[in-house]
Amino acid sequence: MAISLHAVTPEFVAEVGDIDLGKPISASDLAAIKAAFTRYAVLIFPDQTFSDESHLDFARHFGPLETSVFKLRTDHKMRLDEKMADVGNLDANNNILAANDRVRLYQLGNRLWHTDSSFKRLPAYCSILHGRAIPPIGGHTEFADLRAAYDALPEDTKRRIAGLVAEHSLMTSRARLGFTDFDETERKAFEPVPQVLARRLPDSGRMSLYLASHAGTIRGMAKADAERLLKELTDHATQRQFVHAHRWRVNDLVMWDDRCTMHRGMDFDDQRYKRDMRRATVSDVAPTCEQMGMAVAAE
């Protein structure tokens, strides 16, 4: 039986049915998933009860996997495989993280609008998130369509941002919430990297904004002007008409295209309810500036 596809929104989010991702995927089903992903950018696969190993195997169909940033900390006991980002609120013993736990405070940055791994010179192509335990109230994820947001920009704004390069750092987004607890290894790993503000997607040919709370400066622009422009673009891109809220069900698997979306996790009572979320992240094929044919020196 071929997979089924149900559009949740006309051109942004779709639900994929009649497939068990814990089993080998046929070439025709994989091709259909990839075609749907190019069109929609966010795909929802309900009722996926597979193992972490099957999760990672599915993700590898889309490219090489990233390693969790928590691997940088020798004092951090990882709960999951190093290729799996642990973005819930549980410690290594599956207990709820204390309110003052470093990992919890770090994870609060995920409630800002962001794009996964835009703080890496080679950023993410896509993220594939599995919901193992879901709070009964809150904790949904909002997604913003940066392709549609780009299309809706005034033409003079499109011309204004063409060729502009922002500097992204994980420390920038965390500092917005007052989190600065990084060791020297992390500070070196999270030095700012250049990313274009607008990019063309090679598979569809569409233009998209490329934004995240990790971005704090724009090359060749005063800090205040850069922050104002980044806020203006983010406010534009997160208007209701560009945003879809996914309300999680246990064992939902959601994958999204990090090249042309932003997302944020919404509040929930993280001292009362467990939220076990496991993400595989696939690397992009090249740095964004390189993909846009721009030679950008390190600063």
Question: Which residues make up each language-model segment?
Answer:
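Fe(II)/2-oxoglutarate oxygenase catalytic core
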Residues: 3-255, 259-299
